[in-house]
Amino acid sequence: MTYTGQSGGSFDRSGRITMAEVLDAIAAQTQGLLTRADFVTTPCAHALCYQVAYLLIDDEGGAPIPYTRFLSRETLRACLGERLYLEPSARLEEAMKGAIMELYAKDDAESERALRLLKKQLVALFPKDRDVSAEEALRAAEKSTRAIYVHSHMDAENFDTERLAACCDANCYADGTQIPVCAYNVLYRDKEERFMTEPREWGSRDRGRVFASDVVALVHVARAGDGRLRLPIAGQS
């Protein structure tokens, strides 16, 4: 569960950390194993919302190898396409084939290690003696790969309708409504009994901050009969 937006009202709002600062902290904590250059933005979302790095795991205890060491950042973004996560696709298959060929042509220890790990992954995904189900293949891929996602949620102070309109992460309802997650966190979460012992009222104040009404004034919205806010998300009008 993510507590952001108005539900983060009890946190020190002056203690913000930017996406760049998070990436620098990761680089420092990993002692350079991961750098800013190993992260890419997610194409299906606004560029300020997500940064992701994929790592090839060494099951013998060696350091993980970021995908950007054998795939360009542009190729990795292209393989992500219109999804938040890497999924099997012809584009990803071709990219990995190209990466294997380039690694094979190199003559250094790290390239050889990356080749060895990729070979292990391929053997697990495509064993010679049997076919594997899609579920088995997914589990094998998850075992040999890790992803680090940095997600910059919005709250009332940095609420940006341009980012909201490009959102690809939404709460979905039976009537087909999709509410971008940051819009839900800011406008709805603290008014639902399942999340709040004492749900707040629209327009109520907390330490001088108006809940929801300031944000609603920023966006052009259409309301359905239940009063729930409908905001556009990427790919929908």
Regions found by a protein language model. Name each.
Residues M1-F39, P43-H46, E60-G62, G176:
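Conserved C-terminal portion of the radical SAM core fold
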Residues A47-Q51:
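A short, glycine/Asx- and small/polar-enriched loop/turn
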Residues L56-S237:
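Radical SAM enzyme core and accessory elements
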